[in-house]
């Protein structure tokens, strides 16, 4: 047999082997890899069903069809907000979901939409209010410091549009990949002391992917055409100076008037109860946002006559904001009072008001002698340590869970 024949047979054999392997791979792919279009039935309503290619996560699949499920962490599985009920399909619940979903909920079909792989036809159940959620490209009106580490971001909604939110609600804000240099931040001189002390100007935030985060609104429904946020910059803690700074807060702090920003919403469950009970608002830091929204809504839109008070904790006098607004509301509404407590007042503050942590101030100066603290409704938003201290104090007073309403987004 000539060398040329042997070579030809070798090539032919090799080709056959390659073709067989390709066939095996294609067969395996057809069985194991998602392909083709699938249908997701929603709320047993044929008109709400969506059809799309298999292979994505449920959160992204719904978003691609204009159905936006809340996800403060942007689909990372850490916030636990994107809970939906999967009635059919979706596979087994994953370990990453079990920190947010208990055994009873898992048995009933509740899942994190960001963790569910869409491999075949599915049936899901979504809250009806989700179908009112939309996206808007907004324009930055202003982005000004209200405290050392808090900016007020004011956004203009596109002309002719409106975000039909309720006081206490929140929106999600999006950002594309970007690089932010802290040295480029526009921060008034009066707030430079801590920035210089900790050399915060040295930080750089580099983000390589699309991100989404949730922020409570400081605006209230009657402030038409705008969305207002209070955003605290998430700098690395002093004991971990090499940790990366907060991605979204860094991005928001870099925004300037005229910049475009994509938001979606409205979302929320931190809403005021429709009762005649006394309302006690407790806030700290950027937790001011939903407090402002609620109090303005109660007094300026609803003209509520319910007895209400607002207790706000700040470090020093320069960390107090919206003071003139709340002073005016107090002067105009005999049913409303507000108090500030400074935890670290400066000598130059010449502060004669309350001092200490806000939960202690609230207890010592009001609730300790209140005839029925368990009958009040408590609305709070602030740093986790504040929230925990307030909740413990209220529990010790006999306040039931149903009268303790917490917004986790402030801090």
Swiss-Prot record:
Its EC number is 7.2.1.1. Residues 36-130 form the 2Fe-2S ferredoxin-type domain. Binds 1 [2Fe-2S] cluster. It catalyses: a ubiquinone + n Na(+)(in) + NADH + H(+) = a ubiquinol + n Na(+)(out) + NAD(+). Residues 133-273 form the FAD-binding FR-type domain. InterPro entries: 2Fe-2S_ferredoxin-like_sf, 2Fe-2S_ferredoxin-type, Beta-grasp_dom_sf, Cbr1-like_FAD-bd_dom, FAD-bd_FR_type, Flavoprot_Pyr_Nucl_cyt_Rdtase, FNR_nucleotide-bd, NqrF. Keywords: 2Fe-2S, Cell inner membrane, Cell membrane, FAD, Flavoprotein, Ion transport, Iron, Iron-sulfur, Membrane, Metal-binding, NAD, Sodium, Sodium transport, Translocase, Transmembrane, Transmembrane helix, Transport, Ubiquinone. Pfam families: FAD_binding_6, Fer2, NAD_binding_1. The chain crosses the membrane at residues 5-25. [2Fe-2S] cluster binds at residues 73, 79, 82, 114. Its cofactor is [2Fe-2S] cluster; FAD. Its main location: membrane. CDD domains: NADH_quinone_reductase. It is found in: Cell inner membrane. NQR complex catalyzes the reduction of ubiquinone-1 to ubiquinol by two successive reactions, coupled with the transport of Na(+) ions from the cytoplasm to the periplasm. The first step is catalyzed by NqrF, which accepts electrons from NADH and reduces ubiquinone-1 to ubisemiquinone by a one-electron transfer pathway. Belongs to the NqrF family. Composed of six subunits; NqrA, NqrB, NqrC, NqrD, NqrE and NqrF. This is Na(+)-translocating NADH-quinone reductase subunit F. The gene is nqrF.
């Amino acid at each position: 047999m000539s060398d040329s024949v042997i070579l030809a047979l070798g090539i032919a054999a090799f080709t056959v082997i390659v073709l067989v392997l390709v066939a095996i791979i294609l067969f395996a792919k057809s069985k194991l890899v998602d392909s083709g279009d699938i249908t997701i039935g929603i709320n047993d309503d044929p008109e709400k069903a969506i059809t799309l290619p298999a292979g994505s996560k449920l959160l992204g699949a719904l978003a691609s069809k204009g159905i936006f499920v809340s996800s403060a962490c942007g689909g990372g599985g850490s916030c636990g907000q994107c809970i939906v009920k999967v009635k059919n399909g979706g596979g087994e619940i994953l370990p990453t979901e079990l920190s947010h979903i208990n055994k009873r909920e898992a048995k009933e079909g509740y899942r994190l939409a960001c963790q569910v792989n869409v491999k075949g036809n599915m049936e899901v159940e979504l809250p009806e209010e989700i179908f009112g959620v939309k996206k808007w490209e907004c324009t930055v009106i202003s982005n000004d410091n209200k405290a050392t580490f808090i900016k007020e971001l004011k956004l203009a909604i596109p002309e002719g549009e409106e975000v039909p939110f309720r006081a206490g609600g929140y929106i999600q804000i999006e950002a594309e990949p970007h690089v932010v240099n802290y040295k480029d931040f526009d921060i008034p001189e009066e707030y430079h002391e801590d920035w210089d002390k900790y050399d915060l100007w040295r930080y750089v935030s580099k983000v390589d992917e699309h991100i989404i985060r949730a922020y409570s609104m400081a605006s209230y429904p009657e402030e038409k055409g705008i969305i207002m946020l209070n955003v605290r910059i998430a700098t690395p803690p002093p004991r971990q100076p090499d940790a990366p700074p907060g991605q979204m807060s860094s991005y928001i702090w870099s925004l300037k008037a005229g910049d475009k920003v994509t938001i979606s919403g409205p979302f929320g469950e931190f809403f005021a109860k429709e009762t005649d009970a006394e309302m006690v608002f407790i806030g700290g830091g950027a937790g001011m946002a939903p407090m402002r929204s609620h109090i303005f809504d109660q007094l300026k839109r609803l003209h509520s006559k319910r007895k209400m008070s607002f207790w706000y904790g700040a470090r020093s006098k320069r960390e107090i904001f919206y003071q003139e607004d709340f002073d005016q509301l107090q002067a105009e509404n005999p049913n409303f009072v507000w108090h500030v407590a400074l935890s670290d007042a400066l000598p130059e503050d010449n502060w004669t008001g309350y001092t200490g942590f806000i939960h202690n101030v609230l207890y010592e100066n009001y609730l300790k002698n209140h005839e029925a603290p368990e009958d009040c409704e408590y609305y709070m938003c602030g740093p986790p340590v504040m929230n925990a201290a307030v909740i413990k104090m209220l529990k010790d007073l006999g306040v039931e869970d149903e009268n303790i309403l917490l917004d986790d987004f402030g801090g």
